[in-house]
Amino acid sequence: GKVLMIDGDKVELENYGVLYLDDNFHVYTTYGIIEETDIENILVGYNITDFVIAGKKVCAAVISEPMVADNIRVMIMTTGFTSLFHERVSVKATGDYIVKYGDVEEVHKGTEIVDIYPESGYLSMGRISITTVNKEDKITILNVNKSYGNPSYRGDIEIALYDEGLVIINEVPIEEYLYAVVPSEMPVRFGVEALKVQAVCARSYAYKQLMNNSYGKYGAHVDDSVNFQVYNNVEEKDDSIRAVKETYGQVEAFNGK
């Protein structure tokens, strides 16, 4: 299953929940040269790793294919970028949306608000996933304010409970992530050509940070602040979307990296 979180002694897999790692846990790659590698190379958000379970513990992980980066997982911080952890989460959407927890799927009208608290029954079975019925719609987070108001997000939203509070993760295609990074990092008045340069830089940085797996213990790659790249503080603009589309897949590299 897809890796949702990995920490020093446990891993969370989609549809399997949290599994603990054996004291003699090892990680191997089997594409190219077969060799042992580090746990840091198990990337969250991807399903390229097979896990070997014995006695209710994970004793090994086998990374069976190279990673092809398509999605990025972003932690959404509180208003003012003051914390990774939220006291509550309130959502609605621009169209019908689905809240999934455990084996339960609730369908809500876009205008219906769902409130989630740490003690909420929604969280009794682990992470919550929120998806729109129509992939063109967006999910709005009402407990966060950005420069343009309550932010709306492409892709899916996950909510997980930690000791410090709730974390919000937006899983989104990298190209669509850039739609809301480019205008947040550079004023669109600079024009499309300047925005195209920004798009290439932002894409390059996103790929690098995705591979670093910095927030693996929370199930994310980056957050939405200046710690990485500011994301969705300014809403998408036509010119920023155009700049991303016209540079699709282009990255900067130095010495092959």
Predicted regions and their residues:
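Conserved, single-site charged/polar hotspot
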Residues: G1-K257
